[in-house]
Design a protein with these regions (language model features):
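A detector for short, charged/polar N-terminal pre-domain segments
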Residues: 1-9
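Short, charged recognition helix plus adjacent turn
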Residues: 67-98
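Helix-turn-helix/winged-helix DNA-binding modules
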Residues: 20, 31, 45-48
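Short amphipathic alpha-helical segments with heptad-repeat character
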Residues: 8-11, 15, 57
């Protein structure tokens, strides 16, 4: 998925959420503190700052799920035998030099 397609899909999803709550753009703007012009632009072309997106998601829901989806998923050991056999070695937590 391209960034533009992702922005468009996110904007469509948020518009559907707004409508499912039976909120007008003006109503959502007032509840979230996001300017009406910003909300309109977001729903039309997907452009929005992360701060304003978070404000909208606080009102419409989904912020916790978005934060959880961005978390690093690590696979732990499933048994003591895996720990003792050393199948998984600790990963370095440093970035590489460019």
């Amino acid at each position: 998925m391209t960034p533009n397609k992702a922005k468009r899909r996110l904007a469509d999803n948020m518009r559907e959420r707004r409508l499912s709550f039976n909120l007008t753009q003006t109503g959502l703007s007032e509840r979230s503190g996001v300017a009406l012009s910003t909300l309109r632009k977001f729903e039309q072309c997907g452009a929005i700052s992360i701060d304003n997106l978070f404000k909208l998601m606080l009102v419409l829901g989904g912020l916790d799920e978005m934060i959880e989806a961005s978390a690093l998923k690590t696979s732990g050991f499933s048994s003591i035998d895996e720990v003792l056999s050393g199948k998984e070695t600790p990963k370095r937590k440093r970035g590489s030099r460019s």
